[in-house]
Every structure is written in structure tokens, then in C-alpha cells.
Amino acid sequence: MMKINLNADLGESFGAWKMGEDDALLQVVRSANIACGFHAGDPLVMRNTVRMALAAGVSLGAHPAYPDLQGFGRRPMKMAPAELEAAVIYQLGALAGIAAAEGGRLSHVKPHGALSNQACEDAELAATVVRAVRAFDRELILLAPALSELHAVGERAGLRVAAEIFADRAYTDAATLAARTQPGAVIHDHDEIIAHVLRMLDAGGIVAQSGKVMKTVMHSVCVHGDTPGAVQSARRLAETLAAKGWELVGLPEMGE
């Protein structure tokens, strides 16, 4: 049976502010990327999310970001390499500590927002992120967008890298995500989200808005939890994939 992973960015509430339906999404996805306090999340949210993920049998991942709570980590920043490397290690350590206290451990790392977007195009920035991951725990899986610099740099550094595609985001001919400001960049229709994923899996690569196909391996599909109807879309996608013969597994199982 063909294997595929579904992942979601979770734990992005903080304080009195609530984001997403994490408890419901955890019944659908197989891997959770948990905010580590820099773009969202706080110690209590992180702990509660870890507990829910462990109870659901979902693999735990860190979702480190630039220090940008107000901008939700989506604003590009320029940080000195040493500063950024330390910031990523700090976030990994925070979540790993909480996971250990709850009897779990991290399986993967997925950079968030602008940090991910910039690292996907800038090999030097990607190398800084990869150094941080290797320094913290070189057994961690790096979950990186397929065909990105981050993916390539991670592989060259000897990390185990999982290639990610996005269910609800349109692609450019360069295999990058279309800017959120562009029409059609974020896909909201449930049927189109499912069709978009199936097109890519059937084609064996990323399918751009233009129809261009860029061949690549694909290990994981990201379903965003902060879009309207996210849970319904994720549930329908999971059901459709299962009906078409795909086994939904955690990231650590993708290489088995």
C-alpha cells in the first residue's frame, strides 16, 4: 500500500487568543507541527497541544519561527546567522522539554512562515536552520517543501528530509508557493483542495497554477488549520486518500 503523511501546524493560540480547531484536526492528521512561542503558542498551549497529540497517537514536531508574535511569523526578517541558529535551538529545546515531561519526544522540525519561505530560496539561510537542527538532534526529520533549497541543503547535510506539498496553496512555475496576496494563492473550496492534492500525487510532482508539472518525491501533505472549514477539508482529504489506496502514517513511518 502507498504511504503518505498528513501534517498540520498546531498550537498556534496564545494567552486568551485562540487559533484553529486543534483537537479536531488531531483526529485526522498523523503529524503535528507545534508552535514554539516565537510566532504563536505559549508554555501552556504548547503543553496542552503535546498532550492532545500524544493522546491521538500523532507524531510531534517543532514549528520554529522568527521572533514575530504580532506578525504571526509571516514577516521577513534579517537575523545574524549565530542569532538565528540560537533562536531555532532555543525553540526546539523548549518544545522537546515539554514533550519529555509528557512522556514523548520530537520526531521532526518544520520551519514556519517567513523563516521557511526565505530558507526555501536562500541556501545560506537554509544552512543556518539546518545547522541548528543538527546541533540539537541530528536524528530529527526535517520537514521541508519539496524542491526547495531547504530540502536540498538538509539532504546534503545528512539529515533525514521529508518532502512536503501543500493542500490549500497554489504553486508558481518555480515550485514555490504563490504569494498570499495573489488571486487564487490560497484554495478554500473543499473539492478543489482534494483535486489539487490528487493532481500532484497522480502526476508525481508539484503542479503549478499554469499546469506545469515539476517531478519530485512527496512524503507529506500539509493541511492548514487556520483557514475556514479546515477540519472538514482535512477529513474529506483523508477519506479520499484512504479510498484511493493511500495509507496515512506518521512521519517516522514514511521511511519504513
Curated annotation (Swiss-Prot):
Gene Ontology BP terms: carbohydrate metabolic process
Catalytic reaction list: 5-oxo-L-proline + ATP + 2 H2O = L-glutamate + ADP + phosphate + H(+)
EC number: 3.5.2.9
Keywords linked to the UniProt accession: ATP-binding, Hydrolase, Nucleotide-binding
The keyword Transport belongs to this UniProt entry's keyword annotation: no
GO MF annotations in UniProt: 5-oxoprolinase (ATP-hydrolyzing) activity; ATP binding
Top-rank EC class of the record's enzyme: hydrolase
CDD domains reported for this sequence: LamB_YcsF_like (cd10787)
The keyword rRNA processing appears for this protein: no
Superkingdom to which the source organism belongs: Bacteria
InterPro entries: Glyco_hydro/deAcase_b/a-brl, LamB/YcsF/PxpA-like
Record NCBIfam families: PRK05406.1-3, PRK05406.1-5
Family label: Belongs to the LamB/PxpA family.
Record's subunit section: Forms a complex composed of PxpA, PxpB and PxpC.
Function of the protein: Catalyzes the cleavage of 5-oxoproline to form L-glutamate coupled to the hydrolysis of ATP to ADP and inorganic phosphate.
Protein name from the UniProt record: 5-oxoprolinase subunit A
Lineage of the species this protein comes from: Bacteria, Pseudomonadati, Pseudomonadota, Betaproteobacteria, Rhodocyclales
Gene of this entry: pxpA
